[in-house]
Amino acid sequence: MRHHLFIVCGMLCILSMAVPSKVLCAGKQDAHISYVLKNLSLGKETVAKFRPVLVQYYQEIARVKAPRKALREKYRDAEESGKLTAKQCDELFQSKQKQEAGELEVRTRYYTKFKTVLSTQQAYEAIRLCNDKLK
């Protein structure tokens, strides 16, 4: 019995490593969407109208974050070992600035889109909730 338990645990560990990171990100995105919708306490009709806009928002934020994420992955070993070159540091800094500017542009644009479905107060709260970090 114990032997079977170890085999099952081992297989689950292997399968969890085989799950593509995009699937994990999608799960994280779904959790964030649920968090925002739950905390806004919207009615069913409003949720039905707002959810697609919220999904688009998270897709655009992910698109803006993707280049920096790829660059950080590329330089991960050098960053962790404290051996980044000056050029790499500059690239990482510039990518962070570009990401933050892109996120600001997306948030500003979607605040306006959110207000087409939600009240101004709800749109403000939605943007605030979208920026919360989930554990």
Explain the meaning of each model-derived region:
Residues M1-C9:
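Bacterial N-terminal signal peptides that target proteins for export
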Residues H4-L5, M17, E91:
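Short linear motifs in intrinsically disordered/low-complexity regions
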Residues V23-K135:
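Charge-rich (acidic/polar
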Residues V8-A18:
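Bacterial N-terminal signal peptides
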Residues H3, I14, V23-C25:
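Short, low-structural-confidence N-terminal segments
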